[in-house]
């Protein structure tokens, strides 16, 4: 089915069919922030060294399973999805190297959602810069570009990263190792702070810091998706 395009009409969403719409949405989903191949779940130890060869195809689920999930969501009364993706999912291999397979997968997922009567709000998600700094979003090659070794962030106390702290063999919730929702502490840790400072204020605080012939700020902003 082709859903009517929604427009803003005062306090309402109004479709091109003239009807008013109330959107009832669900988040889909948290695991879109990490790779599907290899499994990027945050309870699995990694130093992220293979960040250029990951794949997000299959997040939040394989296309073959999408119909089952979408039909359930419709049956439960939902008509809107907040569908997550990240900069890393699209451009993890390097500058201007876009993962065409992932983009094809993501587009197909959106078309299927439309077939099941689900509107899609695409959330280009980012938390505390990237997976390497305890969150998600930016690809790892940006650290290479500015000369930061993300494999040393945890040891240096520059980031609070679950992949280094969680004991996979022990399993379960581990409040002693990684208390729930403490990823947000990375807003005050150096690795995240350095990257955002370079991104928004590099020309002010370090105007002579050059990356491939450009100021660090200009380099980061020109590459941002």
Describe the residue ranges of each PLM region.
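Active-site mouth of glycoside hydrolases
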Residues: 20-23, 28-225
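N-terminal module-boundary/linker segments of secreted carbohydrate-active enzymes
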Residues: 1-22
């Amino acid at each position: 089915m082709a859903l009517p395009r929604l427009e803003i009409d005062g306090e309402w969403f109004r479709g091109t069919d003239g009807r008013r719409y109330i959107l009832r949405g669900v988040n889909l989903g948290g695991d879109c922030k990490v790779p599907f191949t290899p499994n990027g779940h945050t309870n699995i130890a990694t130093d992220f060294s293979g960040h250029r060869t990951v794949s997000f195809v299959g997040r939040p689920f394989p296309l073959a399973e999408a119909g089952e999930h979408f039909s359930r969501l419709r049956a439960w009364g939902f008509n809107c999805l907040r569908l997550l993706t990240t900069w890393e999912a699209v451009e993890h291999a390097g500058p201007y190297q876009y993962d065409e397979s992932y983009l094809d997968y993501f587009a197909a997922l959106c078309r299927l959602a439309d077939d099941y009567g689900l509107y899609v709000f695409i959330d280009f998600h980012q938390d505390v810069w990237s997976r390497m700094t305890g969150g998600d979003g930016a690809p790892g090659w940006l650290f290479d570009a500015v000369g930061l070794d993300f494999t040393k962030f945890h040891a240096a106390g520059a980031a609070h990263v679950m992949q280094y702290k969680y004991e996979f063999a022990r399993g379960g919730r581990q409040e002693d190792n990684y208390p729930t929702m403490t990823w947000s502490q990375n807003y005050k840790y150096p690795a995240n702070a350095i990257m955002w400072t370079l991104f928004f204020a590099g020309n002010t605080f370090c105007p002579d810091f050059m990356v491939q012939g450009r100021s660090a700020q200009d380099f980061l902003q020109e590459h941002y998706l």
